[in-house]
């Protein structure tokens, strides 16, 4: 029975013979022309296929005996497979356990084999212990004691496996070689008999703890031998790549491990072969680059993705993908952009370019991004949209906006050079912002940030120069800037500052045709509209300062041009309606002008009442305008809003009182009508004068005849 079991064992283990690692063992069946393939003749020396699980050659006779034994074992193995793998366990009696009577530690101590597995394997006492175990088995057929079981119980599967492979390469005598060979076979058979999967053996060998150094560990040979044994016996399709990928925790971890392994001489060859196998597997499975990006967990944070070493794995995959798919030209930057979006990629690269540790990589990827856009036939306008500059330029961090502007500018240069185009950054921005008005406004907002100021000022200058070269008048630029929508909008629109910039440049080139912002506004809207808007705006806390400055400029402009009060009255188109409630702004402006006029010309003073009275055509027309306004204010409950009408009424009625005109004489002396035929407004004038007259008369009487106490 013992000889029979040995034959079966020999059959089991001989099926494990073969190459240790090659691309056919690691990779998917589909070849990849861009990846180095390891043929048998190119496999590393330490992985040569003839180095495992063969009993060393001695004599021709012994070889013949071994061949006969092997064939017998294989035949028996075939029968076993047919009847079920479970029966194999019945023939194998080499499980890793200690004797029932003595613990493994005690046995090793007796034979002085407990001072390290390496020493134990080359100790003469190993043979003595082997004989002892064989004797136990002979005396007690139920004994499960085995040398490999005792060693494993004390030292562990991983330490024993590693030491056996190492010893196999260093022992000298034929007996020692045979002993190591038997122990290695015994270890494999013990795992098999206890239904250990290849994944279980990976765990037993503690390869995960070795990280990338596992690729150079002798334990890797043991894992590969066991995997081949399982594949032969079970007709399995397990590969070293799959086993390691599962064992190390997935493809992302495996990819990182292989990258690290490629950096070291002792692990480079196997790491390269396994990486090629991994890339081939993905290509065969028809994964798109973005899918591999997700597999490598580069899809969660772009900045981290750029610093993650597995980005090199993705880059390598893209090269293989393009070779296998000539019609598709994927790129690393294109894959990132497809997942994260062009704008986010640009933002992160701008930030990374300011970090000394990532600057070089960021600049290279920035160049790749420009090339990717060009290869995909992107226009300058499309790149503007991709970068979302319309939203970003006036609203976000100036440094980021500046970086995006520079990126767009560089793309335009590349586009013009490669496509013989004539695009400009200014033209692209103008289109992107739907016109010069929006662009100018965005540039004004962005110029306050020191990071973007230089680029923004440059663009402002180009826009101004473009208008100057066209010979545009300031009023035309006013329209280009969208300042022709009404004076109220002008005062709150920042583009008035851009118009001021243009006027300054215009004046510097047109010395004999100089103008100003207030003159430009007046030329477009009219003095009266501008004056009214400025007077109203002075009551708005947000616009008061701007309105006051512009109003002062308007008044001084009239003065410097020699305008009289009558001229300004005419310019302002003052009429009866200017006395109406909430409508007296132009009369107030006239009063401000007369005050300034009198301040400048103290020798000749102008009386505002006289100017207004004369321009209205005398007392009657002025009285009709003033009383009409007062009546409307009473009807609308707005008496407090007609202060200027009240002042003119008091001044007018005061003159009549001073001329001793009694109320009953107003019809005939002032209005030139018969009282019976007077209209409602004329009767109202008389009524209001009567009230005024009585009040003034009462005051005069009280002063002349004070009441005695």
Swiss-Prot record:
Keywords: Host cytoplasm, Host cytoskeleton, Secreted, Signal, Virulence. A motif (RxLR-dEER) lies at residues 51-66. Transmembrane segments: none annotated. The keyword Heme does not apply. It is found in: Secreted; Host cytoplasm, Host cytoskeleton. Induction: Expression is induced during host plant infection. Its main location: secreted. GO terms for cellular component: extracellular region; host cell cytoplasm; host cytoskeleton. The RxLR-dEER motif acts to carry the protein into the host cell cytoplasm through binding to cell surface phosphatidylinositol-3-phosphate. Effector that enhances P.infestans colonization of Nicotiana benthamiana leaves. Belongs to the RxLR effector family. This is RxLR effector protein PITG_15110. The lineage of its organism: Eukaryota, Sar, Stramenopiles, Oomycota, Peronosporales.
């Amino acid at each position: 029975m013992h000889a029979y079991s040995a034959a079966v064992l020999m059959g089991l283990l001989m099926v494990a013979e073969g190459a240790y690692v090659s691309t056919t063992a690691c990779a998917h069946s589909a070849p990849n022309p861009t990846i180095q393939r390891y043929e048998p003749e190119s496999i590393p020396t330490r992985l040569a296929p003839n180095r495992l699980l063969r009993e060393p050659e001695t004599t021709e006779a012994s070889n013949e005996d071994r061949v006969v034994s092997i064939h017998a074992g294989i035949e028996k193995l075939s029968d076993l497979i047919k009847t079920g793998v479970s029966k194999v366990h019945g023939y194998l009696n080499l499980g890793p356990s200690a004797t029932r009577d003595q613990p493994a530690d005690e046995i090793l101590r007796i034979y002085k084999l407990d001072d390290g597995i390496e020493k134990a394997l080359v100790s003469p006492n190993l043979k003595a212990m082997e004989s002892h175990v064989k004797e136990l088995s002979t005396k007690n057929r139920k004994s499960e004691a085995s040398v490999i079981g005792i060693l494993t119980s004390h030292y562990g599967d991983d330490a024993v496996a590693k030491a056996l492979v190492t010893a196999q390469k260093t022992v000298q005598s034929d007996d020692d070689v045979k002993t190591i060979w038997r122990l290695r076979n015994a270890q494999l058979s013990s795992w098999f008999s206890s239904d250990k999967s290849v994944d279980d053996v990976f765990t037993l060998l503690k390869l995960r703890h070795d990280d990338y150094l596992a690729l150079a560990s002798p334990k890797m040979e043991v894992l590969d031998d066991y995997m081949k044994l399982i594949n032969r016996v079970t007709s399995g399709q397990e590969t070293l790549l799959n086993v390691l990928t599962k064992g190390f925790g997935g493809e992302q971890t495996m990819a990182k491990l292989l990258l690290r392994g490629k950096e070291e001489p002792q692990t480079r060859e196997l790491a390269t072969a396994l990486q090629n196998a991994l890339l081939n597997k993905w290509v065969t499975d028809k994964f798109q680059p973005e899918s591999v990006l997700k597999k490598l967990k580069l899809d969660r944070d772009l900045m981290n993705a750029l610093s993650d070493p597995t980005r090199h794995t993705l880059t390598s995959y893209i090269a293989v993908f393009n070779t296998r798919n000539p019609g598709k030209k994927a790129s690393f930057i294109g894959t990132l952009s497809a997942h994260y979006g062009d704008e986010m990629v640009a933002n992160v690269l701008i930030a990374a370019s300011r970090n000394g540790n990532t600057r070089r990589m960021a600049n290279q990827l920035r160049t790749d991004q420009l090339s990717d856009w060009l290869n995909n036939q992107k226009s300058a306008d499309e790149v503007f949209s991709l970068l979302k500059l319309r939203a970003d330029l006036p609203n976000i961090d100036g440094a980021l906006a500046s970086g995006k502007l520079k990126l767009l500018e560089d793309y335009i240069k590349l586009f013009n050079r490669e496509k013989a185009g004539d695009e400009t950054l200014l033209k692209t921005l103008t289109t992107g912002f739907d016109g010069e008005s929006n662009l100018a406004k965005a540039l004004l907002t962005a110029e306050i940030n020191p990071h973007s100021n230089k680029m923004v000022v440059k663009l402002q200058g180009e826009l101004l120069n473009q208008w100057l070269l066209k010979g545009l008048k300031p009023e035309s630029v006013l329209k280009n800037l969208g300042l022709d929508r009404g004076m109220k909008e002008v005062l709150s629109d920042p583009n008035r500052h851009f118009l001021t910039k243009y006027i300054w440049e215009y004046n510097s080139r047109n010395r004999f045709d100089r103008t100003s912002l207030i003159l430009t506004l007046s030329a477009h809207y009219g003095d009266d509209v501008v004056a009214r808007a400025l007077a109203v705006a002075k009551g708005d806390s947000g616009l008061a300062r701007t309105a006051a400055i512009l109003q002062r400029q308007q008044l001084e402009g009239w003065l410097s041009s020699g305008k009289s009060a009558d001229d300004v009255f005419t310019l302002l188109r003052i009429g009866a309606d200017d006395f109406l409630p909430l409508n007296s702004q132009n009369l107030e402006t006239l009063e401000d002008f007369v005050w300034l006029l009198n301040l400048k010309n103290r020798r000749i003073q102008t009386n505002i009442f006289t100017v207004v009275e004369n321009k209205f055509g005398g007392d009657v027309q002025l009285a009709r305008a003033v009383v009409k306004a007062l009546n409307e204010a009473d009807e609308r409950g707005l008496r407090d809003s007609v202060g200027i009408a009240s002042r003119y009424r008091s001044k007018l009625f005061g003159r009549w009182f001073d001329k001793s005109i009694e109320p009953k004489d107003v019809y005939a002396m002032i209005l030139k009508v018969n009282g019976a035929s007077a209209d409602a407004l004329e009767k109202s004038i008389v009524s209001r004068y009567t009230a005024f007259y009585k009040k003034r008369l009462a005051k005069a009487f009280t002063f002349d005849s004070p009441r005695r106490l």
